[in-house]
Curated annotation (Swiss-Prot):
Compartmental location: Secreted
Keywords, sorted A to Z: Cell adhesion, Secreted
The protein's name in its UniProt record: Complement receptor 3-related protein
Lineage: Eukaryota, Fungi, Dikarya, Ascomycota, Saccharomycotina
The species this protein was found in: Candida albicans (Yeast)
Function in brief: Plays a role in adherence of C.albicans to buccal epithelial cells, and in biofilm formation.
Length: 21
């Protein structure tokens, strides 16, 4: 994660959303 954008999402999606956000 860049900004930990997936706090309520699974860690796999957290990594993806961390890059997007």
């Amino acid at each position: 994660d860049i900004n930990g954008g997936g706090a309520t999402l699974p860690q796999a999606l957290x990594q993806i959303t961390g890059v997007i956000t």
